[in-house]
Regions:
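Negatively charged, low-complexity tracts enriched in Asp/Glu with abundant Ser/Thr
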Residues: 1-15
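Charged, amphipathic alpha-helical segments
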Residues: 18-26
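Short aromatic-glycine-(Arg/Gly/Cys) micro-motifs in beta-strand/loop hairpins
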Residues: 25-53
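A short, charged, amphipathic alpha-helix used as a generic interaction element across diverse proteins
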Residues: 58-73
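Mixed-charge, Lys/Arg-rich low-complexity intrinsically disordered regions
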Residues: 72-122
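Preference for solvent-exposed, low-hydrophobicity sequence contexts
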Residues: 109-115, 133-135, 151-191
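Short beta-strand-centered aromatic/proline hotspots
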Residues: 113-150
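Non-Sec secretion/translocation targeting segments of pathogen effectors
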Residues: 192-206
Length: 206
């Protein structure tokens, strides 16, 4: 049986992770007056959780209203981000297996453009701008590796992140990438090479 999610002394009775926000609605029947219900944001920091902008009330409808407003705001934020990406790059549809080359256990994917499997992303992130990555290393990038983690740089916005090898749908050759992704690939490789360089070389480059 799955353990019930809690936030401190509160039991989570509803939650929604939308965009960049994890929003929870909680109840504590033993709480002091005025604090029976709670709504807050949850952030994961390493192995710990941090609770932000907590509001409490004995009025369930009031807290549900806050919960709904926060979900709506988070959804609006990610809609705006997606619309901006669509405007900048044009076609931003989810990349499927038909559009990339599958990888095997024998393949190295280091310095390859990898496609994150949309089924491993939340629905609002199933777009090419969130899937195309340069794999820069990690034990999971090696052939026949027992490791899983692959370090990646997003070709759309340059953010650095990591995925498991099992999250990767396949690879795409650079010449098959759309123009925006080719530009992002060049920038990602330049940044990676700069970060690899000894400190002295970095200083001279500046």
């Amino acid at each position: 049986m799955e353990a019930k999610r809690t936030v401190g002394d509160y039991s989570v009775i509803n939650s929604m992770y939308i965009g960049h926000r994890d929003i929870v609605l909680c109840e504590n029947t033993a709480a002091k007056k005025g604090e029976k219900y709670l709504c807050c944001y949850v952030e994961n920091v390493a192995v710990f959780e941090r609770y932000l902008e907590a509001l409490v009330s004995d009025d369930f409808a009031e807290i549900v209203k806050v919960f709904g407003e926060r979900v709506s705001e988070a959804a609006a934020e990610i809609i705006k981000e997606t619309e901006q990406a669509n405007k900048e790059i044009g076609s931003n549809e989810e990349i499927t297996a038909k559009k990339c080359k599958a990888i095997s256990y024998d393949d190295s994917i280091k310095d390859k453009v990898v496609v994150i499997d949309g089924s491993h992303l939340r629905p609002e992130f199933r777009h090419a701008s969130r899937q195309l990555m340069l794999c820069t290393g990690g034990f999971g990038s090696d052939p026949h590796s027992r490791g899983r983690t692959c370090f990646c740089t997003c070709l759309y916005d340059g953010r650095q992140t990591s995925y498991y090898r099992s999250d990767i749908l396949g690879i795409i050759e650079p010449e098959e990438l759309p123009e925006w992704a080719q530009k992002g690939l060049q920038e990602a490789r330049e940044k990676y090479e700069q970060e690899k360089a000894p400190n002295k070389e970095r200083g001279e480059a500046r």
